[in-house]
Regions:
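C-terminal non-catalytic regions of proteins with extracellular/luminal or membrane-system context
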Residues: 1-207
Length: 207
């Protein structure tokens, strides 16, 4: 019998919830996923340099000389991500957007959150949705100044982490490797962190 490696997300950095992604309920131009359009200037002006489509959560960075997309510069570029969410059920969902430089989230043309920052900043936008209704979601991004460039986005419904269920899935497994620790996304001098267990960027407990 061959060895098998199984990954399970046991916990979040600070959140006791896990996100069930609704990206499978998103489409644009009749095709599933998110459409990204790229410009090699910060103003999204002129002809785009390229575009692509993804059905995965957005997770891009220029660290390690990676580019956001085909033919895109490492600096002074911009992106427009767009999709339409048609939820299968009514309720409250989370739009989780994290980035550095300039980024803005719009729903049906309304700005929900906007940041221009040199440090990676996490945002959580709660949205009440109705089953079958269309919600146009746009993310505008630009690398500005000499700041780093990174962006993450996912949306969906949050559920409490079920630790008992996670433990039950370990039956029959010989070795468990837990990977955890602190994160520079949360812990740094005078960082604007407003969540339990922190005072600014200083951790007050680690339970």
């Amino acid at each position: 019998k061959k060895n098998q490696i199984v990954y399970m997300k046991g916990c979040d950095l600070v959140n006791d919830q896990t996100l069930e992604s609704y990206l499978d309920q998103c489409n644009i131009d009749g095709k599933p996923g998110i459409k990204a359009t790229f410009w090699n200037n910060p103003e999204r002006q002129g002809e785009p340099v390229s575009s692509l489509r993804t059905t995965q959560p957005i997770n891009v960075t220029t660290y390690g000389l990676h580019t956001f997309g085909p033919g895109v510069n490492l600096e002074k570029f911009s992106v427009k991500y767009e999709t339409v969410l048609i939820p299968k059920e009514s309720g409250e969902i989370l739009l989780n957007l994290e980035g550095c430089s300039y980024f803005e989230l719009l729903v049906n043309g309304k700005s929900m959150t906007k940041h221009r920052t040199w440090r990676t900043t996490d945002t959580r936008t709660m949205l009440q949705v109705e089953k079958g209704k269309e919600y146009k979601i746009e993310i505008l991004y630009a690398q500005v100044e000499n700041w780093a460039a990174n962006l993450k986005f996912n949306l969906g419904k949050e559920f409490p982490i079920n630790y008992s269920e996670s433990i039950s899935k370990l039956k029959g497994i010989d070795v468990v490797v837990f990977v955890g620790g602190i994160s520079p996304q949360l812990e740094g001098e005078e960082m604007p962190v407003n969540i339990p267990g922190f005072k600014g960027g200083d951790r007050t407990d680690i339970e």
